[in-house]
Amino acid sequence: MNYIELKHYLKNAEAIDDFLINNGVKKLDIDNSKNSFINYYEEYLNYYDFKIVKKDLVKVDTSYIKTPARTNNQNHSWYELLYRCIHGDSYKSKANISDHRLLKLLTNLTKMSLEDLKNLYQDGKSNLSLYDFNVFYRDGQPPIYIGINDGTHRIIMAKILGIDYVYTDNVQVYEYNKFKHDVFKEMKKAIKVFKDFLNQSEVFKLSADSTHIKVDVNINSYTCIDQFFYDVSPLDFNKNVESYREYIYFLHFYLKVFKEVEDAYKNSFNVYKHLPLRLLEFMLDSSSNFHLQNIYKHKSEFLRHVFY
């Protein structure tokens, strides 16, 4: 049976689960593949340090494998990736797999026993058995293997069939760095707190591109030249964690300044709720932009004019 015939058969004659069970796959393994969801652990590259590339042949328990090599399959179960090859993917977000490649692998069950297929997956020699991985180690926790390079469809099928282990002779090893993780968490929290403030502020707003801060008063809008928020590259964060500690201080410092301005604005007499442009001269640098430092340097003067 070729993959086209198998797809038609599974779509019209026999349910996928029945086909798998009738060919020796345990129901428990099928259920596990339905309840195990792909997670790329993309944050890990921020605070796990690269150590070494190992080329020795190593056995890998498939329960430690959390993703196939191809990206954009996040939050799908392993089973769903097979299901959508047969029944279509309109019921959920798109996946990054090739239907015919996955189904061609499934046709092996029509040509050999599950036991023979498992032996190929677990012999450490065949194409079905060898994979490349990133592995993340943290004391007291199981290792996490992330597929890289190729082998996407082979490892999906291995997870569905209940293959116990595969092998790797190319694994990039990463180790947990608690200090970097703490800084990363602190940065995320500082960004969230600042953005929550901006969402409810009457004076300060986030720019359309979510990177700069604006002052909106009356019908006028002024954009801060200094950039506040960035797309953080894991590689950059991991190598320059000290500079991100300075960034956290920057966020804390100016959040305090902005809150003082905001509080003064809210507590001023109503007539000052619509500030005349001359009061903004303390912070504005041009007709449409201002420097962040001007808010801090002239904060007391600005606040005094808000009140009087």
In which residue ranges do the predicted regions lie?
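Surface-exposed, charge/polar-rich loops and edge strands
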Residues: 2, 22, 26-47, 51-67, ...
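A short, basic-hydrophobic beta/loop patch
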Residues: 126-186
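Short alpha-helix boundary/capping and kink motifs at helix termini
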Residues: 2-147
